[in-house]
Every structure is written in C-alpha cells, then in structure tokens.
From Swiss-Prot:
Keywords: Coiled coil, Cytoplasm, Cytoskeleton, Endosome, Protein transport, Transport, Ubl conjugation pathway
MF GO annotations: cullin family protein binding
Protein name: Coiled-coil domain-containing protein 22
Annotated GO CC locations: centrosome; endosome
BP terms from Gene Ontology: positive regulation of ubiquitin-dependent protein catabolic process; protein transport
Role played: May be involved in regulation of NF-kappa-B signaling. May be involved in copper-dependent atp7a trafficking between the trans-Golgi network and vesicles in the cell periphery.
Organism of this sequence: Xenopus laevis
Similarity comment: Belongs to the CCDC22 family.
Membrane-spanning residues: none
Length: 632
C-alpha cells in the first residue's frame, strides 16, 4: 500500500493539492486535506462540477455537513459505485478514502489536459506555453497606468493589439519542380521582395501568413478527399483528372456566358454589357473566329488603328508624366491644358470606336444572314441538279427501251444472285464474328473485373499508406512531445533507482505468487490425502464389521468385540468431527481478527469521539441560534 499511497499523493500534488512533504500515506490525511484533495480532483475532471465547491472546510458544523453531502453527490455523478456520504469525508476511514482517491485518480485526464494517445506535438507545447503565459499575466494584479512598471505596461496595454487583416502574398514555390519556368525562378531569386516588404503594414504579416497557410492546407485536404472519392474511380492520372476537370469547368463557364449574351441580346440591354460579354466569349474561343474571318482589309485596319491608338496615347501620357521633371507653375498649366485636350481627343476616338463597333455588329449580322441564304440556295441548286441528272439519264435510255429493259433485268438478276452469295458469306462471317465477339466480350469482362479488383486493391493500399503516414506522423509528434517533456524533467532524479524499485516490486510479486501456488498445491495434496484416509477407514470398518458380525452370532466374546468396534468407530467419528470443528473455529477466529484489524484502521473510536464533539458543537450552535431568536 505504500507504493499506491505514494502514487496517489503524487497525482494529488499534480492536481494542485498542497500535500505536506512529511505525509507519505493516506493514513496521515486529515479531514481538511481530504476535502481539498477531492475538490481539486473534481475541478480537474469536470470544471463545471467542481467550480461551485470550496476546497476549504468551513468552521460551522452545518456548513461542513452540506459540503460533505455535495462532495458525495458529485462523486456519485462521476460514476462512483461504492457507498459514499458526508460521513466518508467528515469521519473518514483509510480504506474508503483510498478507494475514493483511486477512483478520482483514474478519472483524471492524462498529462493534466490531454490523452496520451492523442498527442499534438509542437501545437500542444505551444498551447501549454500560451496557457502558462496567460495564467501568469492573469495572476498579476491590475494597476493604474501611472503605477505600472515597464513589464506591466507591455503586458497590460492594448497598444499592441491589431485587427486580423490579411492580404495576398507572393511567395516562391519549390525550386526543384520541373514545371516552373527558369524565368520565374530567376524572378524569385533576384527580384521577388520579402514578405514584410510586400505589405504596407507590418502587423498584417502574421495574419496574411496564417491565411495563406490555412488556404493551402484546406486546398490539399479537399484535393485528397476528392481524389479518394472520385479520382481513383475515374482511372485517370492526377494530371489528366485535373485537365478534365478544368475543361468541364471551362465549358460550364462558356455556357453561362453564352446564355447571358443571349439574354442581353433578347432584352436589348445597353451595348456595353453585350460588348463585354462578347469580348469574354472571344477570350474563351466561343465565337469561332467569325469576326476575324469576316470583314475587309480596310475594316480590320481601321479596327486595329482605333482600338490601339487610345491605349498607346494613355501609355505615352503616363510615361511623360513619370519622366518629365517638375517645372514651374506656367509649364504645369500648359501641360494640364495639353492633357485635357488629349483626353478630349481620346474620348471622341472612343466614341467613334463604339459607333464603329455597333455598325460592325450590324454588318456581321447582315453577313451572317446573307451567308445563310447563300447556303440554302446552294443546297436547293444541288437537289435540283440531282433530279435533272436522273431525268436526263432516263431520257437517254428511252429510244432503245426493250434492250435496256433486258439489260436492266439481267443486271437485277445478277445483283440478286450476288446479293444471295453475299448473304451466305455474311452469315458464315457473322457466325464466326459473333463467336469472336462473344469471346472478346468475355475477355473484356474478365479484364474489367480484374481492373476493378486491382483498382480496389490500389484504393485499399492507398488508404493503408495514408493511415501508415498518419500513424508515423502521430508517433513522430508523440516522440517529439515525450522528448521535450523528458528534457524539461529535472535531471537530478535517478532513473536507475526507479528501475531498481520496479524490479524489486516485480520480484516480490513473483515470490508471493510462488508462495501462494505452493500453499495451494500443499492444500490440494493434504485434502487428497485426507479423502484417501477417510475412504480407507470407511472401507476397513465395513469389511471388519461384516467379518465380526458373522462370528458374533455364534460366539459371545466376539459379540463383545463387535460392540467395542462400534463404540471405537463412533468415538473416532466424533474425534474427526471435533478436529474439523476446531479448524472451522480457528478460521473464524482469524476472520474475526482481520475484521478487528479492519475496524481498528477505520478509527471507529476516534470517529465516535469526533461525532460526540460535533454533536456538542451542533447543540451549542442551536442554543446560540435560539438565544438570538428570542432576543430578536
């Protein structure tokens, strides 16, 4: 029990219970220490349950009874099945308190906050450091600004707080990837600014990095989930699956843009929106290049000129504004007038461009209608030409109609004969091809089944690989966490002493098991020998009784001997029964001695004295209350 008590005391100290160093056993716990230990454990196990309980025993007896009842109810709510009440805490016994503390110690969360089977690695250590820092800061009293020292000004001031505002960042990818162009790698190495230089405000660096990291992690998780659910079933490589997905997405965007363009055209909305959609459709290659194929050389040259000059003028204006140095006020006014005139020219040119684009659209619609009419006319001309060709052939055959009919009949008969031969050949080929088709279909089905089985095996293998990777990652984090905890432990503790103590305990347990096994085997042998002797005595008495009884009918001395034999057997039976009763009494005596020792450990006399003292204290409190009531 000493080792158990030491482990319990260590667990109670880790929960915050102030157990004195001189206490080494549960037997030395008093009522105040028991109440504090139970309340501390309840607060760690269930903070909402232990928050309403005080770990300090109040002086009044009624308050002590109430807190004892509350503690008993809290332990029962946690699932403690043994009998517990206020007397367990106020008039405690060593076995009951030890059983209750063992139950609470088993309910404590491992590592005081986490389960050892769910390590969190660096994140757990970071959270612990954050919690420790926050607790340390909360433990400091709040002081006015004029009374704070430098450290308190930094910790209790709100000037270092900033809003979580993230901005997009440009970061370099892995340079080992082959798909990245060399120009981009050179840009990353020479010209890409640092993260702190990309943002206008330094406090937004952490928020931007966290946002980018979170978006990357979520994208990776979404891709893994999609690849497990749909990618493996498509039997495509990851690159092909991504390209197919991109094509499907592009087609959907194209259909949506086409529908929006049609709605704008049907509702006669402003031309600017329709023009924007048309340009976007051209970017997706939806217009089929009709605008580029149609139109004269003059219209294409004019469109190019009027669409390019305004941008060129704007770029030239921006360059001129950047290159020209600052001049005096008169030169600035002249430049401003020139810029305004150029802006007016640009506006007029843009207006002309919009008018020309509208006229171009009308011309394109007209050209489309004319092309449709031309195609219809070409189709009708081809149909009429076919009819004329047939009629011309018939007119050429009319002069020699009889011979032509005979020739035609001969051709028909030959065609019929050839058709019959072809049908026979086709039937033979059809049977052979049908067999080949059935065989190929069977082979294909087997291959599909084999492919499905391989796909299922690949998916299971992929899941096993993922599970192994997760398990390896979890074990690596657990290793790092245990290593950090080991490094944080005090180095003066001798590991060899604990190991030697554990080995001694194991050897003692082994010796006890050997002794118990030896005692059990001796008991079995003794019981077997007693049973053999009892059976032998019974058999001997039966045989002797039969032999003596036969001679007792004829001889008087033998009759006396038979009576003595019966009396001897009865006395031996009484002696054996007396021995058995003596053994039973001895066992009962040992049980009673153990019960006496158990009752002695329960401190019955001291508890009775304490109960009497509490009873007198309650009577005194009641008398004081009655006196106050009468005075009131």
């Amino acid at each position: 029990m000493e080792e158990v008590d030491r482990i319990l005391i260590h667990s109670l100290r880790s929960c915050g219970t102030e157990v004195p160093e001189d206490i080494q056993s549960i037997r030395q716990f008093n009522t105040e220490l028991i109440v504090e230990a139970v309340v501390r454990c309840l607060r760690v196990i269930n903070p909402s349950l232990g928050a309403t309980l005080s770990h300090v025993l109040p002086p009044g007896m009624s308050a002590q009874f109430r807190i004892g009842t509350s503690l008993a109810q809290a332990c029962q709510d946690l699932g403690y099945s043994s009998e517990v009440g206020y007397q367990t805490f106020l008039y405690s016994s060593e076995p009951d308190i030890r059983a209750l503390l063992i139950f609470l110690a088993e309910k404590l969360p491992r590592d005081s906050s986490e389960d050892a089977h769910q390590p969190a690695g660096k994140s757990a250590l970071l959270q612990r450091e954050i919690v420790a820092t926050i607790k340390q800061q909360l433990s400091l009293p709040w002081l006015p600004l004029s009374c704070r020292i430098a450290a308190l000004r930094r910790s209790q001031s709100s000037c270092r707080l900033h809003r979580f505002h993230s901005q997009p960042l440009s970061l370099a990818s892995d340079p080992a990837l082959k798909s990245i162009p060399n120009e981009r790698k050179e840009y990353w190495q020479r010209y890409l600014p640092s993260v702190t230089s990309q943002l206008p405000h330094l406090p937004s660096v952490a928020a931007s990095l966290l946002e980018r990291n979170t978006s990357k992690l979520s994208a990776v998780q979404e891709w893994e989930a999609e690849w497990k659910s749909q990618g493996l079933a498509s039997r495509l490589s990851p690159e092909d699956y991504r390209s197919k997905k991109q094509q499907r997405l592009q087609k959907r965007i194209q259909e949506q843009l086409r529908q929006c363009a049609q709605l704008l055209a049907e509702n006669h909305l402003p031309s600017s929106s329709s023009q924007d959609l048309t340009d976007m459709l051209r970017a997706f290659n939806l217009d089929g290049g009709s605008d580029q194929k149609k139109g004269s050389r003059f219209t294409r040259t004019q469109r190019f000129t009027y669409q390019q000059d305004p941008h060129t003028l704007k770029e030239q204006m921006q360059r001129a504004a950047e290159i020209l140095p600052k001049k005096d006020a008169q030169d600035a006014d002249a430049e401003q007038q020139e810029i305004s005139s150029l802006q007016e020219q640009i506006d007029s040119i843009e207006q002309e461009i919009r008018g020309l684009s509208e006229s171009n659209k009308l011309l394109q619609l007209t050209i489309g209608q004319v092309e449709g009419e031309v195609n219809d006319m070409h189709q009708s001309c081809e149909e009429k030409a076919n009819v004329v060709r047939v009629k011309k052939r018939a007119v050429e055959l009319l002069p020699d109609a009889d011979n032509n009919l005979d020739k035609l009949q001969t051709l028909v008969d030959a065609s019929a004969q050839r058709m019959a031969n072809l049908i026979g050949q086709w039937e033979s080929h059809q049977a052979r091809l049908s067999d080949e088709y059935m065989e190929l279909n069977r082979v294909q089905q087997e291959q599909e089944d084999e492919s499905s089985r391989w796909m299922k095996d690949a998916k299971d293998l992929y899941e096993k690989i993922q599970g192994s990777a997760d398990e390896a990652k979890r074990k690596e984090e657990l290793y790092k966490q245990l290593l950090s905890e080991y490094e944080s432990l005090p180095k003066e503790v001798s590991r060899a002493a604990y190991t030697q103590r554990i080995l001694e305990i194991v050897s003692n347990i082994k010796k006890q098991k050997e002794e118990i096994t030896k005692i059990l085997s001796d008991t079995k042998e003794l019981q077997k020998e007693i049973n053999n002797l009892t059976g032998k005595v019974d058999r001997t008495f039966v045989v002797t009784d039969e032999l003596v009884f036969k001679d007792a009918k004829k001889d008087e001395p033998v009759r006396k001997a038979y009576k003595y034999l019966a009396a001897l057997h009865e006395n031996c039976s009484q002696l054996i029964q007396t021995i058995e009763d003596t053994g039973t009494i001895l066992r009962e005596i040992r049980d009673l001695e153990e019960q006496i020792e158990t009752e002695t450990t329960k401190k019955t006399l001291s508890n009775l004295q304490k109960i009497l003292e509490d009873y007198r204290a309650i009577k005194q409190e009641n008398a004081q209350l009655l006196a106050r009531t009468r005075e009131a």
